[in-house]
Amino acid sequence: MYEYLDRRYAVALYNIASAENKVEEYIADLKQINDLIKNNEDLNQIISNPKISTTKKREIFTSIFEDKIDLKLFSFLIILIEKKRIDQLTGIILQIEKVDLDNHNQVVAEVKTVVPLNNSERTALIDKLQIKYNKSIILREVIDKSIIGGVYVRVGDDVIDGTIKNKIEEMKKLMFIKG
């Protein structure tokens, strides 16, 4: 829903981080801060409560993070608080990771199989995906017994579903249409 705005914030922060050669540091810090917000019930309630003033939220963030993270990253978080966007931090992190991948001509391919791929299967899959997308592939393998067999691949919005589970679903649909 807010992907466009998340991307604008992410690009702005990425440009700052890149100029400082701190992209990985910023992403790691943002993930830790996001985890802290999600896992600390009090902090989460403070941030999500519209009745708590922006000034109070800024004071709380300052007391927690001011001397613990890079000053420019801290300033970015304060801007998010002032613009009432701090609750969108997860989306901003996803977007900054996408920007970083794009700038390194990389793409993530999520691969689901019932059993782990062997080295030759992994290499062949990476080679085919690199040709198709003309980018370096970062393979994220997931073992998923529910697919029964075959391979499921997601690259961005593209899905290649060669699973037995999908074939069964397609046959069910055909049976209901003809039946």
Swiss-Prot record:
Keywords: ATP synthesis, Cell membrane, CF(1), Hydrogen ion transport, Ion transport, Membrane, Transport
Topology class, membrane: Peripheral membrane protein
Gene3D superfamilies: N-terminal domain of the delta subunit of the F1F0-ATP synthase
One term under GO cellular component: plasma membrane
PROSITE patterns referenced in this protein's UniProt entry, alphabetically: ATPASE_DELTA
Subcellular location, record wording: Cell membrane
Keyword match Chloroplast: no
PANTHER family associated with the record: ATP SYNTHASE DELTA CHAIN (PTHR11910)
Subunit structure: F-type ATPases have 2 components, F(1) - the catalytic core - and F(0) - the membrane proton channel. F(1) has five subunits: alpha(3), beta(3), gamma(1), delta(1), epsilon(1). F(0) has three main subunits: a(1), b(2) and c(10-14). The alpha and beta chains form an alternating ring which encloses part of the gamma chain. F(1) is attached to F(0) by a central stalk formed by the gamma and epsilon chains, while a peripheral stalk is formed by the delta and b chains.
Role summary: F(1)F(0) ATP synthase produces ATP from ADP in the presence of a proton or sodium gradient. F-type ATPases consist of two structural domains, F(1) containing the extramembraneous catalytic core and F(0) containing the membrane proton channel, linked together by a central stalk and a peripheral stalk. During catalysis, ATP synthesis in the catalytic domain of F(1) is coupled via a rotary mechanism of the central stalk subunits to proton translocation. This protein is part of the stalk that links CF(0) to CF(1). It either transmits conformational changes from CF(0) to CF(1) or is implicated in proton conduction.
Family under the similarity heading: Belongs to the ATPase delta chain family.
Protein name (record): ATP synthase subunit delta
Organism (species): Clostridium pasteurianum
Recorded name of the encoding gene: atpH
